[in-house]
Regions:
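Residue-level "contact hotspot" at macromolecular interaction interfaces
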Residues: 11, 111, 160, 174, ...
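Active-site pocket scaffolds in enzymes
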Residues: 1-6, 142-156, 237-367
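Asparagine-centered strand-capping/turn motif at beta-strand->loop junctions
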Residues: 122-126, 173, 277-281
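Short beta-strands and strand-coil junctions in structured, solvent-facing domains, enriched
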Residues: 40, 128-130, 177, 189-193, ...
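Histidine-centered copper-binding motifs that mark active-site loops
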Residues: 1-170, 191, 202-224, 228-246, ...
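Short tyrosine-centred short linear motifs in exposed loops/low-complexity segments
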Residues: 16, 24-30, 115-116, 165, ...
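Hard-cation-handling environments
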Residues: 185-186, 236
Length: 367
């Protein structure tokens, strides 16, 4: 169940339908979107969330909400912004929409009892925008990531959610009726232009009820995750680059070639691999692997904790991140790519062939 044309299944053409019949096994927060002209179709709003709950996750919070964050752009005539606006330069920057949305709405209002804990499951479904979230300085308790509850909860004043990522947080907004809070997307430097030509965005308003405030106790959530060991793991270099423009076109590359010229990586069924993802470009890249979770071992040589099951992780510019992947099952050909979808369409994609099958040919061309 993957849905990548020419790789895992045929595209679903206009007027056609396709039924997925599958067993739900892994709790976590997921989302779905097309893999045909991804940047365009996701930018136009074709996406949704899929929540797989674990009744035994230990999170006893009554108020729960799923927040799908995104953005959308329009041209001067009020029509959806063309997918190729800005040409090759727009692809390199990663096009962001003009209007930030939450569950398809602009600046919605969420009602809260003062001090009452709420569980926010957050999906970043934007094609390029990073959400660097601040709630008027009030704390977030991060309890989980893409693949469910993480090893240990942690408290922070700001949360970064990059495209494709999911984060599970507890908030206990403090305030009073008539004095709302604002959830904002702060400026985050993901590459040239992402700070210079952008502004802080209001995302959502928290309005308080007149109920008596609650003095909630701090919430601590844990999950036993086996300590990852890189012993015996096969090292795999994944080098992300953006060479100088040629013939007025830019292309991102993995290990020196764009997707339309690349050969698949290979993994034996049951093999453990250590992917050494080196970002040699001047842009951050949210790195996403289809079909498998991974553990983020370290970033710039520094261990990453708490442990969490991830399928998307930001690889900052000029930084190396090591990922431990266990290709334990699910043979077949699987995609990996930057989840800034303009970057993916611009060549920053690849596939890994798991098992002994024959890789499929594709007709993806340089845009």
């Amino acid at each position: 169940m993957d849905g990548v044309p020419e790789i895992s299944q045929p595209e679903v053409k206009k007027g056609e339908s396709f039924t997925y019949d599958f067993v739900v096994r892994d709790a976590g927060l997921y989302w779905y979107h097309p893999h045909v002209m991804s940047a365009a179709q996701v930018g136009f709003g074709l996406y949704g969330a899929l929540l797989v709950e674990d009744p035994a996750d230990g999170v006893n919070v009554a108020d729960q909400v799923t927040l799908v964050l995104s953005d959308i752009g329009f041209d001067a005539k009020g029509k959806l912004e063309p997918a190729d606006s800005g040409g090759s330069a727009g692809m390199v920057f990663g096009r962001e929409g003009d209007y930030v949305l939450v569950n398809g709405r602009r600046r919605p209002v969420l009602r809260a009892r003062p001090g009452a804990p709420q569980r926010w499951r957050i999906v970043n479904a934007a094609k390029s925008r990073f959400f660097y979230l601040d709630l008027d300085g009030q704390p977030f308790t991060v309890i989980g990531a893409d693949g469910g509850i993480q090893e240990q909860s942690e408290t922070t004043d700001i949360v970064l959610v990059t495209p494709g990522e999911r984060v599970d947080v507890i908030v206990a907004p403090k305030g009073k009726a008539g004095a709302p809070l604002t959830l904002r997307a702060m400026l985050y430097n993901r590459g040239y232009g992402s700070v210079e030509y952008r502004s802080v965005e209001d995302v959502m308003t928290i309005e308080f009820t007149n109920e008596t405030p609650i003095a909630a106790k701090p919430i601590s959530i844990t999950r036993e995750l086996p300590a990852p060991s890189i012993d015996g793991a096969t090292p795999v270099d994944v080098i992300l680059t953006l060479p100088p423009m040629k013939d007025n076109k830019s292309e991102f590359q993995v290990n020196g070639v764009p997707f339309w010229k690349a050969k698949p990586f290979a993994a034996k069924l049951g093999e453990k691999q250590l992917w050494i993802v080196k970002n040699d470009s001047d842009w951050d890249h949210p790195f996403h692997l289809h079909g498998f979770f991974f553990h983020v071992i370290d970033e710039k040589g520094q261990p990453v904790r708490p442990l969490a099951l991830k399928d998307t992780v930001n690889v900052p510019m000029k930084t190396t991140v090591r990922l431990l992947v266990d290709f334990d099952e699910r043979p077949g050909q699987w995609m990996f790519h930057c989840h800034i979808l303009d970057h993916a369409d611009g060549g920053l994609m690849g596939t890994v062939m798991v098992g002994d099958g024959t890789p499929k040919e594709h007709t993806h061309k340089q845009p």
